[in-house]
Amino acid sequence: MAKSVLIVNPQARGGFAQKKWPVLEPMLRDALGVIDVQFTKRAGDGTPMAKAAVEAGADLVVAMGGDGTASEVASGMLAAFAGSARSEPSCAFGYLPCATGGDLRRILHTPSELADAAAAIAKAKPRPIDAGRIDYIGHDGKPCSGYFINVASCGISGLVDHLVNEGSKALGGKATFFVASLRATFRYKNALVKVRLDDQPAYEERIYTLAVSNGAYFGGGMHIAPEAKIDDGIFDVTTLGDLSLVEALRLGGLIYKGEQGRLSKVSSKKARRVVIEPVNPDEKVLLDVDGETPGRLPATFTLLPGALLYRG
C-alpha cells in the first residue's frame, strides 16, 4: 500500500469529484505524490476504509468530500488507533473539502480551493487536534459507540440533520440547513434532559438544543460555540434552553453571528466528559454527530485530547 491514501466521496457537492476527476486526479497526484486513491460507494464507507489504511501502515490518510466524509475517515483512524498498542496517533489526517456545510473547513482553516488545500497538506507539519468519543443508543435500541471531530448535539439539531439528509442539498450548505431548521422549529418540542458535566452534580433542563463542541461551527455556518478551539483540550458545552417559538425564530438571526448568548436561555460551560439522558426514558431525543443522526439519548461524550494529527 502507498504510504498516503486518499478516500474520495464521488457524490459530495452534487457529484463534483466524480464529474471533475479527470482534471482533479493529476493535480492531486502532483501535489501529494504517490497516493492510493479509493472511492466510497455509500455513506459510512469512509470509516472502514480509513481504519484499514491505518492498520496497513499508511502515514497519511486524506478525506475528500463533505464534513460527513471527513468525520467518517477521522472515525476510522481513531478506531484503528484505539485498537493499537501505540499511545499516540501513528498516521496524519488531511482534508480536501467538497462540502455542503463547510463547517470543518472553517474550523481547521483549510483553504476552500482544492489545489490550495492539497498544497497545504503537502507542505504542512502535522499538528495535534482533539476529538470526541460518543457512547449512545442506536435507532435499533442497542448500545453503540463512535467518534466525532466537530460537534455532537441533541435536541432539535438531530431533527434538522434528519431533514437535511432526507432531502436535496441543491440549495447549498447554509440555505439547506437554514430551511431545514425552519421546518424543524415548527415540529420540535423541547426535551427535558438530565445533564452531568465531569464530576459535578447532575441537573435537569428543558432544551431546544444542547451541543458538545470540539469545533466552533455546525449546521452550515451556525457559530454555536464561539470560544471553542479544536486543539484546546476541552469541550464547549452550549445549551439553548427552553426557547419559545418566538425565541427560536429570533435565534436564527443570532446564531450565524455567534450572538446567541444575547438570549437569556442560552448558556455555555466547559467540560471533558458530558452525560445526557432523557428524564422520560420513553422520549426519543435524537442526536446530531458531525452532521449525521446515528441514534438517540442517553449518551456520554468523552474528550480525546490530541487524538489526531492534522496536516493542512
Predicted regions and their residues:
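Short glycine/serine/threonine-rich phosphate/pyrophosphate-binding segments
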Residues: 46, 68-73, 103, 129
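ATP/nucleoside-binding phosphotransfer catalytic cores, i.e., glycine-rich phosphate-binding loops
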Residues: 197-199, 204, 223-224, 229-230, ...
